[in-house]
Amino acid sequence: TFGVHATSGMLVYTRREEKRSSEDTLQKSLPRRNQGLAGRFTYAYDSRCFAEFNFGYNGSERFAAHERYGFFPSFGLGYIISNESFWEPLLNTMDKLKFKMTYGLVGNDAIGSSDDRFYYLSEVNPNDGGRGQYFGTNYGNQMNGVSISRYPNTNITWEKSKKGNFGIELGMFNSALEVQADFFYERRTQIYQNRAYIPSTMGLSAG
């Protein structure tokens, strides 16, 4: 704090590894890992004007290397007009009037099934009896085949959400009556979905 100015800042680095016991597949038994860097910076002027900037730079194991990290910033502004000197004649009636707004980008890597951890890798069964071959006398011998239950997609990345908020806070009659109204906005993009049908002309399956 210096004079009528006040600032603050914070950086946080996190790294997490989670291991689960008694999993029924190799994929589930592998450690789950992610890491991220988050920051928060604020500024206030004379208890009237406020600004805040936040960011997250996060990495997820679920995506290919070139899509693994995402940058998600946000900012907010506030203005307490009732702290202005010209508002003093109105303080007995309306002792607080504040306008505020925020806007930011949020990332989500908890998409699809928790069993599908590595979207950039194929899921292959090299010993599938249902895809085998029969040969020999009266076709009495069988050799198991190979099946692919999922093809790799290196373009799958963070689900993103743009979020905004505009609000107003009122305090009247020495805060005997308080009113708060907010308008929220959200728009999601890059939503992961499983296709219900894939045409055979794509050549991804054979029966």
Where are these regions (language model features)?
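Extracellular/periplasmic, surface-exposed regions of secreted and cell-surface proteins
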Residues: 1-207
